[in-house]
Amino acid sequence: MKKFLPLSISITVLAACSSHTPAPVENAKDLAPSIIKPINGTNSTAWEPQVIQQKMPESMRVPKATNSTYQPEIIQQNQQKTESIAKKQALQNFEIPRDPKTNVPVYSKIDKGFYKGDTYKVRKGDTMFLIAYISGMDIKELATLNNMSEPYHLSIGQVLKIANNIPDSNMIPTQTINESEVTQNTVNETWNANKPTNEQMKPVATPTHSTMPINKTPPATSNIAWIWPTNGKIIQGFSSADGGNKGIDISGSRGQAVNAAAAGRVVYAGDALRGYGNLIIIKHNDSYLSAYAHNESILVKDQQEVKAGQQIAKMGSSGTNTIKLHFXIRYFGQSVD
C-alpha cells in the first residue's frame, strides 16, 4: 500500500493544476517552474498562478467613453423662440368683416381688442382707427407709440408697434369695457379731433399774465361755402339743451343721395357708434367737422378727399326706425346750429 502513495499524490497535484487556466506566456522560457509559486511559501496543495501583465497592442484602437452633450435648457429656449415666431406669424391670419360694396369694416362684428400681437403689419384697407380698435388701444396711444402724427399715412407692409406686450409704466393701460363705451369714446375722439388742446387754449404769456377766454361761438361768416347735404324736409331741428338733438334730421326716401356739405377729408366711415348707423365724418379744416348718420350705404373710404356736393352715401334707416339723414356740424368740437 505504501508503494501507491506517491502515485496518488501525483494524480492529485496534476488534477489541481489542470483545474486552473494556464497563465499567459510570451515565449518558451516562461514555462519555467518559477511561473507558479505556493501561497506563503508552504507546501500546500493549493496553488495560485502568477499572471503576467501584457500591454494592449498599439495598433488596436481603444474606444474612449464620452459624456453626453444633451443641453435641455438650450433646446427649450430654441423651442420657445420657434413657438413664439410661429405664434406671431399666425396672429394676423384673420380676415376683417367688411361691407362687400364699400369695403368698410363692419365693427359690430369685430371684437374690440382681439388682436394680441406686439407688432402689426399693415394690410390693404387698414386704417389707424381699425388697427387701434382690434388692438384695444386708443388712436393717439397707437400714434404716439409709433411716432406718428396726423394725417396718419399708412403703407402696406408697414410694421406698427402694439402696446399688448410692452411693459411701460408710462403707457396708459387699456381697459376692458363694453362695446357701447368703446365705440362712443372712439368716435367721439374723432368727432372732437379739432377741439383745441390745453396748450392751444393758453394765450401767449404777457407781462401782466392776463388770460384771454377762447371764443367757441362760430363766427357769423366763415370761409366754408356750406350746401345742403340732401333734399327733404327738416323733421327735427337743432337743440342746444342737454340731451337735445345736436344737429338736424332731414326726411327722404331710401337710396336718396347724401352729399358732402363742403369739401374736405373723410376722417371716419363706419358703423361703430350705436344709434347712428352707418356714419361719415368729414374734416373741412382745423375748425369744422360735419357728420352724416343713418345712411343705407357708405360710398367713400376713410382718408378720402371729397368735394362739396359729391355723393358720399345713400339715405337709409341704419341705427334708427325712420328713413332720414341726421346732419350735424361742429366748430372746435362744439355742436352748432
Swiss-Prot record:
UniProt membrane topology term? Lipid-anchor
Query: Does the keyword Lipoprotein feature in the UniProt annotation?
Result: yes
Gene Ontology terms, MF aspect: metalloendopeptidase activity
Q: Where is the lipid attached (N-palmitoyl cysteine)?
A: C17
- Pfam families recorded: LysM, Peptidase_M23
Q: What InterPro entries has UniProt attached to this entry?
A: Cell_wall_metabolism_enzyme, Dup_hybrid_motif, LysM_dom, LysM_dom_sf, Peptidase_M23
Task: State what protein this is by name.
Answer: Outer membrane antigenic lipoprotein B
Give the species this sequence originates from.
Answer: Histophilus somni
